[in-house]
From Swiss-Prot:
Positions that bind Zn(2+): H111, H115, H121
Family: Belongs to the endoribonuclease YbeY family.
Protein name: Endoribonuclease YbeY
GO cellular component: cytoplasm
PROSITE patterns xrefs: UPF0054
């Protein structure tokens, strides 16, 4: 079972209500499609500034991003790693895509979790595998396929 330590550094996230329950729902769905015996995740819900700095420091990209994942080393298990999510980028993307922000956050957390387990989307085949898992996890929560353009 996945446990997580939630750190909220931007008060804007409070608009989503019970963040612990929302994150629990996301990680339960993620674990449904990619189970682990046990694992702990450090989860940071922050602002664009924090994600911008992390993106610059660790990916040499000088801009904010929606979500970043930092897998732990195998010897550090059961700690799976860190996930950080930016309020501004996430809220803007959800609005542009016409999605509820809570559903978008759930998707980002599932996406981040899969990265912690080693899934990636650098190639078309990797992307197809990862997206299929995300779609299945989201469907278990009655959240629409985020990759379908209707």
């Amino acid at each position: 079972m996945i446990s997580f330590d939630l750190i909220v550094e931007d008060d804007s996230w409070a608009a989503l209500g019970d963040l612990e329950a929302l994150c629990r729902k996301a990680f339960d769905a993620a674990e449904y499609v990619a189970p682990v015996e046990e694992g702990n995740i450090a989860l940071l819900l922050a602002d664009n500034h924090v994600l911008h700095q992390l993106n610059l420091d660790f990916r040499s990209k000088d801009k904010p991003t929606d979500v970043l994942s930092f897998p732990s080393l195998p010897m550090d298990r059961p700690f799976l790693g860190d996930i950080a999510v930016a309020w501004g980028v996430s809220a803007s993307d959800a609005k542009i895509q016409g999605k509820p922000l809570d559903a978008h956050l759930v998707h980002l957390l599932i996406h981040g979790y899969l990265h912690l387990l080693g899934f990636d989307h650098e190639t078309d085949d990797e992307a197809a595998e990862m997206e299929a898992l995300e779609i299945k996890a989201l469907a278990s929560l009655d959240i629409a396929n985020p990759y379908r353009n209707d």
